[in-house]
Amino acid sequence: MRDDTCDYLSLFLNDTPLLDVRAPVEFAKGAFPGTTNLALINDEERHRIGICYKQHGQQAAIDLGNTLVCGEERERRLYAWQQWWQANPNGYLYCFRGGLRSQTTQAWLREIGIDAPLVTGGYKALRRFLIDEMEACIANLPLEVLCGRTGCAKTRVIEQQPNAIDLEGLAHHRGSSFGRRPGGQPSQIDFENSLSIALIKQRAAQPVSILVEDESKLIGRCHLPFSLQDQIKSQPRIIIEESLESRVQVTLEDYVIGPLQEYARYFGEHDALKQLGDELLASMDRIRRRLGGIRHQQLRQQLQEALAVQANCGNTELHREWIHSLLADYYDPMYDYMLSRRAGTILFQGSRAEVSAFLNSR
């Protein structure tokens, strides 16, 4: 029989399976990577029990819960937990504070012979632990910042380095006005939880430094912690420099060719290009004010023509026109301004291949 645990660090370092028995509405606001939500009480039941608790006290609320979740419904939920536990025998369960819902779930499982240890303090304690660890890691771990103009394939370099944290991957967003991906983004709490876990795993590996991409305060709608924003502005930099032609090719792959495959997985082959085209046009419209009316109209027209050719024969070459203009006239001046405001020492500067070789040599 395993004991309940308060070793939160071990849970996250080992990717321990976690069963979240909170209501779906609570889970949607914030959870942990890989956690499974099989609620003891659903949203409506939670609402009714909460009102009962406020009006009549704990015992009345418990009695109402037992009335709402009984018979076949109780057996259905118990069976779902049983199936999960058989697949994850080293797991732990938790509710919000590690209290009555966890203990009730634990007791029901014990009735059918399953030892189900819980996380002491529940979700609230785990969340507090991750917030504290995230801030400690940001303050104490040595960071290096990978910089470069749009299309330098910074994310590809990040993905190849074992001591790197892919912030855009955690945010499920490519980090620009055109960076939205099908499936949407995690909640802010989910993003922070994933970031904290990535940081403590890097700390455990004891790298010489941790590499992150030069990001603004927002990756899509995910907000970087203020402390990390400050570190990105001040820590040593590694700069990738690539020709405009090379960056146009990478941007074509990252904005058009690669995303089309993603959209096909979400919406099917038939609707993928329309969905992607609508998103690209919406992205162009979102930066209309910064582009200016005439330039926005020109780029939008080029994009529409490129999408029409692609729909007709599958050729993506015409996309290079609007991408070239977008990089040269919009993203490059913005990047040059931002880079001029960075204070960190430049550790290395070179092509993507040279930067990768530099990183791999250490």
From Swiss-Prot:
Catalytic-site annotation from UniProt: C95 (s-selanylcysteine intermediate)
EC number(s) recorded for this UniProt protein: 2.9.1.3
Keyword Protein biosynthesis: no
Domain Rhodanese: 12-135
GO BP: tRNA wobble uridine modification
Quaternary structure, from the entry: Monomer.
Listed name of the protein: tRNA 2-selenouridine synthase
Species: Alcanivorax borkumensis (strain ATCC 700651 / DSM 11573 / NCIMB 13689 / SK2)
Organism phylogeny: Bacteria, Pseudomonadati, Pseudomonadota, Gammaproteobacteria, Oceanospirillales
